[in-house]
Every structure is written in C-alpha cells, then in structure tokens.
C-alpha cells in the first residue's frame, strides 16, 4: 500500500515530520553536481525568498518552481528555482499538485552566479507546513509484496523482468548529507557514520588514462553542454545511466531479446540474446550493439559499436569502447547486481570497472522524455 501526499494533505503530512535545521549539504559526487547544475549557483550566497507560487515545471532533467518573490522594497520579481528531476521527485512522492498556484511560500537556497532571477532550491516552506528539504520523502510506502513474484520464467531463465531502481539516497537529519534510505535511522542515531557509507557509484571509476585520455579529461568542461551530454538532454553512457540519480528502469525479457528502457532520458536499449557474434557492419550509436547469453544464472552482455562519447564525466571514450556487463539476480533479496568492465585503448590503459545493485522499484517505470529548461544549457534559445 502506498499513500501519496498531495494538495490539501501536504500541510497535515509535513507537520508530522520533524523540522529540518538549515545546513549546507555536502554533495555526493562530482557527477551529482554535474546533473544538478550547481556550477551555475554559488553556495557561499544563500538566499531566502518570500512570495507566491506561480506554478511548477515538472520535467527531466531539472524541475523548476516558478515563484513571485517579494523584495524588501515591496517589488515583485519572477523567479525560477531549480529542483530535482521529475523522475526523482516522483519516487519521493512529490507531485505537481503540491505546488498550488497562489500559495504563500518561502524558498531557501542559493543564488545564481549571473542571473538574479534564478536560484537553487534547497528547502521550501509552503503555507503553515514546516520547512522541507529538496530530498525529503513525501510518501509512506510499505515494503513491496514480492511473495508471488516467480524467481524464474517458464523457460527457466531468472526472472529479471520488471521495474528496477537503485535505493534512494535521502536526508539523514543532523548528519549533513544524503544516505541510503535503509540507513537513515542508524545514521540519525549515531550507530553509523556518514563517512563509513560507501559512495553511491554515480561518479567516474578510477582509471589510468592514455596521454590523450588525460588531456581530454583535464580539458573537460563540466558545465558546458558541448562537453557534457546531460546538459543537452542526451544520455551519458549505458554504464552511468543505469543508476545515476536513481532512475526507474524497465527490463522486458522476450524470446530472442531483452529490452531495457532507461528511466531518466527515456531511451531504449536492445540486447540480442543467443546471437553468436556481433554483425560486421554496425551503425555506431550511443548504446552500441549488445548481445547476451546466460552463463548459468548470470546474464552476460557484450557491447561494441559505440559512437565516441562520455563514460562518466570527465572520462571520455572512443568508437573502440568495449563493455562487458554481468547481471545476477538474488531471488531472496530481490536485488539485481551488475558487474561491468569497459576497455578503450584510445583513452585508458587499464580497465574501467565497477559494480552496482538495484532493487525492485518503489514506483512504476514511467516514460518521461528530457525537457531541458535551463537557459544556460539552451544556447539556441539565446538572442
């Protein structure tokens, strides 16, 4: 059972949650910063804005609160305040209906470096409700009932079909940061220290660059749409986009293929099962050409045929990139672990390797194409 908190329920629900002391949160990784656009904002310049909600643009990769702020001189300024991606807000129970047009609100955040009509929304207080952080949860969700979920398909393969997502990273009050949802109580009680929690895996993996790889990584402009594909509504890589920022992805097992629908940018990837070899003439693409086979209960996926791109900013790759992924289901915990290894002789001399784990998703997969509204990332819209 799941109870969403919307509209009139907002104030009542918020009053049941402890107040949040103002604090500057430590960002999890460079990759997280890149997505949330903190390069545009100055954390040394906190802002507190009082005014009226005009609406919300509930989109990926950044949602925006439209807000009429009233200054000390009584004049009104139309503000745009950046929030999290719609996909991530939805997982936390946020809905557009919470932001009632005309409602009084206070926004706490950080000033834009160049645009006085823009801000980064860190906390918000709507009406009489307590102040809430951008990463807070607005839904109460009981554990997903998996008792009737078959561990295998009729054909015998492990049942990896369905909707999957990395565990949410949420606020641990008093800890000054985000932690995996299942550790919140332990962190708040002092049983577990934030510094002892493994990273989210959203950032680049350690790798030894070639001379070219190092030069291009050093020159990479994190906040430039020309360099960073996420800032121009393009996926980054099949490695990063599987977990970065906690999207809900869908796997569909078919007779001769496995289809993965990635949640944050709504693109489809096809894995051709039991194809002996890649075709000779592959048209290079973002996702490459993937073939897979089962080694016991492990799905092994081999992918080549990439167009040059970015593995995880600032690590770039060439059309010689070769990725091998191994997906293994734990039918007792209902987790899906992926180990991956990437090789590219043009950009690095060793292997770019890592592992991640996703859970049965807490909300259904929902196609939600990218709609970048940040003016700085839309150069064609500028006069």
Where are the regions that the model predicts?
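Boundary at the C-terminal end of the N-terminal hydrophobic targeting segment
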Residues: 32-34
């Amino acid at each position: 059972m799941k109870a969403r908190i919307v509209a009139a329920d907002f104030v009542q629900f918020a009053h049941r949650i402890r107040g949040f002391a103002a604090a500057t949160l430590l960002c999890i990784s460079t990759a997280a910063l890149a997505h949330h656009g903190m390069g545009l904002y100055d954390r040394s310049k906190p802002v507190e804005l009082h005014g009226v909600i005009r609406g919300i643009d509930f989109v990926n990769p950044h949602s925006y609160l439209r807000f009429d702020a009233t200054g000390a001189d009584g004049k009104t300024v139309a503000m745009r305040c950046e929030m999290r991606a719609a996909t991530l807000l939805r997982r936390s129970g946020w809905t557009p209906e919470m932001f009632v047009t005309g409602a009084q609100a206070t926004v706490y955040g950080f000033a834009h470096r160049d645009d006085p009509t823009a801000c980064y929304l860190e906390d918000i207080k709507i009406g009489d409700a307590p102040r809430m952080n951008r990463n807070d949860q607005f839904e109460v969700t009981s554990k997903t009932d998996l008792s009737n979920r078959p561990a295998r398909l009729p054909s015998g393969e492990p049942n990896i079909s369905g909707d999957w997502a990395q565990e949410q990273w949420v606020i641990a009050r008093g800890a000054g940061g985000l932690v995996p949802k299942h550790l919140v109580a332990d962190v708040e009680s002092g049983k577990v220290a934030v510094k002892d929690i493994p990273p989210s895996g959203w950032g680049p993996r350690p790798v030894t660059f070639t001379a070219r790889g190092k030069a291009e990584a050093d020159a990479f402009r994190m906040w430039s749409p020309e360099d960073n594909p996420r800032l121009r509504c393009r996926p980054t890589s099949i490695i990063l986009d599987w977990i970065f920022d906690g999207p809900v992805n869908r796997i569909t097992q078919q007779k001769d293929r496995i289809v993965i629908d990635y949640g944050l940018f709504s693109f489809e990837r096809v894995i051709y099962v039991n194809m002996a070899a890649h075709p000779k003439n592959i048209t290079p693409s973002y996702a490459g050409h993937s073939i897979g086979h089962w080694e016991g209960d492990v799905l092994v996926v081999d992918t080549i045929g990439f167009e040059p791109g970015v593995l995880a900013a600032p690590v770039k790759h060439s059309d010689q990139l070769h990725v091998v992924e191994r997906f293994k289901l734990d039918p007792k915990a209902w987790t899906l672990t992926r180990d991956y290894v990437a090789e590219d002789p043009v950009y690095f001399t060793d292997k770019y390797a890592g592992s991640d784990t996703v859970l049965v998703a807490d909300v259904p997969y929902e196609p939600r194409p990218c709609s970048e509204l940040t003016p700085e990332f839309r150069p064609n819209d500028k006069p």
